[in-house]
Amino acid sequence: MRHCINCCVQLFPEDTHKQQVACQGGPHHSHQACPTCKGENKILFRVDSKQMNLLAVLEVRTEGNENWGGFLRFRKGKRCSLVFGLIIMTLVMASYILSGAHQELLISSPFHYGGFPSNPSVMDGENPSDVKEHHYQPSVNNISYVKDYPSIKLIIDSIAARIEFTTRQLPDLQDLKRQELHMFSVIPSKFLPTSKSPCWYEEFSGRNTTDPYLTNSYVLYSKRFRSTFDALRKVFWGHLSHVQGKHFRLRCLPHFYIIGQPKCGTTDLYDRLRLHPEVKFSAIKEPHWWTRKRFGIVRLRDGLRDRYPVEDYLDLFDLAAHQIHQGLQAASAEQPSKMNKIIIGEASASTMWDNNAWTFFYDNSTDGEPPFLTQDFIHAFQPEAKLIVMLRDPVERLYSDYLYFASSNKSADDFHEKVTEALQLFENCMLDYSLRACVYNNTLNNAMPVRLQVGLYAVYLLDWLTVFSKEQFLILRLEDHASNVKYTMHKVFQFLNLGPLSEKQEALMTKSPASNTRRPEDRSLGPMWPITQKILREFYGPFNTRLAQVLDDEAFAWKTT
């Protein structure tokens, strides 16, 4: 029979500093409670990320035994303390060395690889009213992060030394057709001359009892869109053209696209612009069809599903097509050549930058760069499309993006650590591949704990300018939009050749409250650390400088925001 020596050690991940557990040891032959301590609760202390005395967590309890002398009891208790102390120290050091993770054991390097979340699958805009609050910064830094700055600066310098804005190789039309045979068979090469939006009539072979949206993937995979399509079903047959026993439906693509960027005010721009009577948007604000749904990506974390056919995308514009059809029918009787003024828009904030699906569907090129980009296909069908881009200081965009999409443990400290992790991952890619290859690298983008790549505006814009002219773009800054909404909206109206609004309509559009406001719990977290801001400004600096050169506007360098 052995005596109970209670040497209890336990690590707790929570923030409590002690916890009680029942002792189950003691001088017994079976699993009954220890007669010495009588199952009493023992106090266990937490070992956290601060400096710690490992032996302080050991509690040795020995009580008298008639067969042992005092000296023997003292030696055995001391020996147990020493053995358990060495065991705990070994386990802690092994955990630190093997994982390098910051798991409240020891303060680890900020450059570690952990479990990285996948990128979110839903993009959204940023509220202009949140812009000004980002300029305030706390007066002090986390001291440990300041000490880490020299090593982080080496990473940033390494990235900057490898930045080259090279010209991409453009695919020819036949290559595009081979990749999307069905899409090219559905969308014609010419559109109706009397519609500002690219529209055409196609034959509908169903009957008046046929459900045209029965197999639409947007309906099947999202309950919130079903009411919209229920309304479209009820009026569908009445909006067909009936000629010599045949039925024709009007199909349309967008006249303009709001292509980006996420957390840059696209939602607010969309909400104001749709108040104009000549503008009609898709049934869903962000279909993400060009970048995701046509590849079968519903949520990135769920992998690939069945691809959404182009017909499902075109269904989203049926409500606008119905109104255009009515206008065309009315005009044909009076003035056949009269142009229909209604224009269709689409506002997926992923269109400009997200090409993550290419590795799953296109043959890999020898240099790691995607052979096809989203804009190649849009240009193939709509070479005259108009493109609107809303941008903001990429440093503040990244923090807003982090606050919006992070689900738990959000803080300035957590953001700083994720930024440093992302920078190291990006540098590792740049050591072996080109800038473009890294920006469009799906594995890297899913590994980075913050979406560092979304703020590399110059890379994306230069690639879009390989197929579209600069005159087809309207590029806005969220900072300007937040300070003067009326001026921004007038620029948009002029760019889209929209008619003037009445005073009442304009007041409603410009004085409406900002959309997509920041959540109160995110506001309470405050701004990022000044040292984090400094790191990000140095990283994004070369890209902002190039963007300002391309646009011939120093405001896009964000040197004084």
UniProtKB/Swiss-Prot annotation:
It is an enzyme of class 2 (transferase). It is a single-pass type II membrane protein. Keywords: Disulfide bond, Glycoprotein, Golgi apparatus, Membrane, Signal-anchor, Transferase, Transmembrane, Transmembrane helix. Glycans are attached at N364. Its EC number is 2.8.2.33. 3'-phosphoadenylyl sulfate binds at K263, C264, G265, T266, T267, R392, S400. One of its GO terms (biological process) is hexose biosynthetic process. Coiled coil: none annotated. GO terms for cellular component: Golgi membrane. It is found in: Golgi apparatus membrane. The keyword Transmembrane helix applies. This is Carbohydrate sulfotransferase 15. It comes from Mus musculus (Mouse). The gene is Chst15.
